[in-house]
Amino acid sequence: MKFKDWCVLKTKLSGICGSDHKQIFLDGNRDNPMTALISWPQVLGHEVVGYLEKGKSKSNLKVGDRIVLNPWISCLSRQINPPCIACQSGKNTLCRNFNKGTLTPGIHTGNSSDVTGGFAEYLPAHESMTIPIPDDITWEQALLSDPFSVAFHSILKVPVKPGSICAVYGCGNLGLLTILILKKVFDDVQVIAISRFSHQAAMAKKFGADLVINSSPTNRVIEEIADHVNCDIFSLKRKRPWLIEGVDYLFDTVASPETLEIGIRIVKARKKDTETNSLLSGVIVVTGVSSPKRYEWTPWYFKEISIIGSNAFAIEEFEDHREHAYFHYFRFLEEGRLNPTPIITHKFPLEEYKKAFLTARAQKKYKSIKVIFSFNDN
């Protein structure tokens, strides 16, 4: 261990995140500005559960305890004192010091050369990054703490309430978890899922989506939403239609030029609550990342739509609890309100990493959603 207050974790399970997938297959742009905040060489894998193998912890954890990793390497783990304004408020995913302190640049485990990831038998973790797994929560449930919290954080960006109509674009890991949370944690929310593949559509229905629409053809997506919410549709002959009414909120877990263009066409024009000044409609929350291209954005200004970025998770306030998103998740599990583990469709030993990544990539062929690595306890 290079620095004080660091531990060694022995990996039990690690999940393939969409960001891992994009990096392995070079699915992105070389000029992505995030490259200024990462360093090489890298060992990927930031969705990790395992055992505390070595190291002392101020949180009274002991060797052999089950741990879920909080992968963000911000001020505390970088030995920066005083911490930045974001870390002081519990929003360490917005840390101002990802390229400073005692560690090489990196925003989270797996993209710093000092903080290697969970696609390995062992990995380092600052004690602040180690969260104990409650006894009644399974390894698989705990492994989904990170993607669940990403979805939960995105929903809390808008004031979802009874009667809200929400669309979720994309039914991969984040999209399906967003659907599950909206239907199982919130009351009386209508959810429209837009999926690419039939096995994703089936899981969206299993998780409670009120309407599931195939993402192609795109004009049909708009038409089906107009039918569902019973609103007027506007179009010129042979041109892509759009709506002034539509859904209140869209959670875009793909964030491609096409999904953003469809999004600004299906989201209802802006409406504000006169008492709280919160936006009751006209908001797109973006959690996905795709390469930029041109798209037609006229409805964006016309309907005064707000497009909000949502980055990972933080200390969240919900149902009179203010705590890290992982602990909200644990509470929902313990109360029996939901179980997201059906999204885990494939499990591989690390030695079969090529097969695992190809399975994650060929979603239609293998009917894959969440692909994970499993390590022996011995």
Range-by-range predicted roles:
Residues 2-14, 29-88, 132-136:
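Glycine-rich beta-strand-centered segment in the early N-terminal region that forms part
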Residues 35-37, 46, 75-169:
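NAD(P)H dinucleotide-binding glycine-rich loop of Rossmann-like/cofactor-binding domains
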Residues 238, 261-264, 271-275, 323-378:
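C-terminal hydrophobic helical "lid"/dimerization subdomain
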Residues 249-254, 265-294, 307:
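ADP-ribose/adenylate-binding Rossmann-like module
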Residues 226-240, 244, 291-345, 354-355:
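C-terminal substrate-binding/catalytic core of Rossmann-like NAD(P)-dependent dehydrogenases/reductases
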Residues 128, 134-224:
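Mid-domain Rossmann-like dinucleotide-binding core that forms the NAD(H)/NADP(H) cofactor-binding site
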Residues 195-196, 288, 311:
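Conserved acidic E/D residue at the C-terminus of a beta-strand in Rossmann-like folds
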